[in-house]
Amino acid sequence: MLKSTPVKEALAGTAPRDVILVQGWVRTRRDAKTFSFLELNDGSCLKSLQVIADAALPNYADIQRLNTGASVAIRGKLVASQGQGQKWEVKAETVDVIGAADATYPLQKKGHTPEFLREIAHLRPRSNLFGCVFRVRSRLAYAIHQFFQERGFVYVHTPIVTGSDCEGAGELFRVTTLDLQNPPKREDGAIDYAKDFFARPTYLTVSGQLEAEAFACALSKVYTFGPTFRAENSNTSRHASEFWMIEPEMAFCDLQGNMDLAEEFVKHLIRDVRTHCAEDLELFAKFVDKELLSRLDFVLDRPFQRVSYTEAVELLTKSGHKFEYPVAYGTNLQSEHERYLTEQHFKCPVTVYNYPKEIKPFYMRLNDDDRTVTAMDVLVPGIGEIIGGSQREERLDVLQKNMERHQLDPKDYGWYLDLRRYGTVPHSGFGLGFERMLMFVTGVANIRDVVPFARTPGNAAF
């Protein structure tokens, strides 16, 4: 049985082939007097393969009825193309129509807005733009695993259902099998979660960090890469309710080592995509963001500037720039502040470190000044924050005080405190939002357009 050849492989051929089988979807059909041109795409690459179907073919009448979107299997010869724009084309000997597409097929040969394509998310991967997005997404995921595996990290699967809130933000999706119309109650009238499936309140995870810390304190270097969930009612272009996170954790690692790895990681991902997704990136640079390639190279070519939070606030305050949100010590930097630092002041990526303890989670290591913690955020041009991390608090007594300050019950984190009781060790880690990185390397401005089926407030279609 003849094996099908991907379009990408056929186009990259170095010699003609007497027999080839290609399968895919018709992008366009053009009829001449004695033959038809078919543009065939199978998603393996951006370009389509031109097929010449002669009028002498026994089912030529069926071929002339092929609409955009129809699926076909074509057997023929791979020959040098007589036309411009492609090196090879297929001279068809048989054209089998696998699945017809009627005239209502919404992806006709014209431009479509991202807003329209979000409404047909089940079909939009067939468009040029979204085919590119999801090929880059696939390659980026591969590059992530490659980076950590080559450096001796162990890949850990952390739980999706959890009883802890790593960030302490309270923006959690609850998981329950209780009857919502008539839940069991305790004597005080509160819902009795002891009768729930897990016999306690449980949620979809917001982070795998705490569990990853447990494994780092045994395997030294680990990373997680999986879905996370936030019930944050933010209907913006940067927020989604379901997204993927990469979270490495390293034992015997301080803030300096953490910042070094984060910078190396970001550059590796950009370099890999620039090397392996050149054709797709060219489309983004042409139609999405004309500054994309220069911005990616800009990040690759420069060391990241490092500045303390205190210094960053002073720079922003003295800049004279009018911000929508005022700059003040003790508040989180807004996206406009982050972009000012990277795009106008330093003109390069920036790592901000040592934040006030009041605005960071309980697990971050307290500095000797008793005012700041060893937090760090990596900021890049065009996006702002792309990585957030810290050295973790390894001292049991200090961690317990941090939990009290954040009004967390130590009983809920007994296992986490055990990591400090039994062979504690300095350790660090960070989180990179996968979709945010994908937005950065493609120039796509809305997170809904880099997720296969976006989950946002008020929307869980498909």
Predicted region positions:
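Class II aminoacyl-tRNA synthetase-like tRNA-binding/catalytic domains
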Residues: 2-247, 251
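Generic non-transmembrane alpha-helical segments
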Residues: 143-151, 265-276
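A translation/RNA-centric and nucleic-acid-associated enzymatic feature enriched
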Residues: 161, 171-271, 282-462
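Structured alpha-helical bundle/scaffold domains in large eukaryotic membrane-trafficking regulators
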Residues: 277-281
